[in-house]
Structure formats: C-alpha cells, structure tokens
Amino acid sequence: IPEDRHKYGMVLDYDLQNNLILENYWKTRYTKGKAIQNKKTINENSNELIDKYDIRSGQGSSTIVRSMSGGNQQKAIIAREIERDPEILVAVQPTRGLDVGAIENIHNQLINERDKGKAILVVSYELDEVLKISDRILVMFKGQIVGELDPKNTTREELGLYMAGSKNTYNFKEGD
C-alpha cells in the first residue's frame, strides 16, 4: 500500500473496476483468452469489493477514481492489495489525510488481516495510529533502529522521543 496513492497507487483516469484489478488483470479469472478482459467477472469482483470495503463512488464500479474522495481512493487500494492475499502486507502512511471514518475502516481491515495470521508492516508518522494497531513497534531515526517498544506499555511521549532521536535503547544484533 503506497504512501502516495495518486502517484503509485492508482491510475486516476481509469474507472474503479480497472483500478481494483491493476495487480491482477492477467489472472485467468479476469481474462478470456490471452488479451480479452472478462468484463462480467471484473464487474462482479468490483461490486463485491465496493460492498465489502465500503467504497463510496457515485457511479459504482464505473466511477473514474479521480472524482472519488481520498478516503474512498485509499479504501480501494486497501481492498485491491488485501484481495491479492499476500502473506506480508506493507502499508506506508495508510491513513494520511483521511477522515476519522475512513481511518477507522482502514485500521479495521489491517487488524482483520493480522488476525488471519498475515504479517502487517505499517510505516507511519501518526503516533496514535502506531499505538492503536501495532503488536510490536520498531522505531527508526536516521535510518537506524533506535527502539523496540510494546504498544501496551508505552506512551505517545515516549514513542515521540524515540522518533526524534532523543532516546536509543535498541542494541541491534546480527540476526535481529
């Protein structure tokens, strides 16, 4: 899940259904033969994801994503990436610039994937987000790990001190 949803996450002038299969367009499920798209299956898949991930779009799966809110664009990216069923999901700034409702939705989706046994790596500058959805926090400063924290036993203030480079208690060992 890229940090810049417009530059790396979506093709803004494509409709929602084509954005939802960007990484999967070549799969047999979405094709008829070697080059022809199976529009019916693509549309059904899009409608399922729109419902499952609460993606709000004015014209359903035919909505041009440029016209959608940032929160709904982000939910579409999350839907697409989760539906690829990765063992490891890397989410960079997954809720940057989103409203409270969209943030809650995305956090719930990430937590659901974690609960299914998936590894979720979240890179975020949002301290509350890090504390809310993390099982383990590794803090970096100037490219180095400076702390390993348990979110249940740390505060925003302590986490902020590590992020600012004021604290460094992590002794990196080979193999960690």
Where in the sequence are the language-model features?
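Conserved P-loop NTPase catalytic core
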Residues: I1-M68, G147-D150, T155, L161-K167
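ABC-family nucleotide-binding domains
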Residues: V92, D99
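H-loop/switch region of ABC-family ATPase nucleotide-binding domains
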Residues: S124-Y125
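A short, surface-exposed alpha-helical micro-motif characterized by mixed small hydrophobic
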Residues: V130-K132
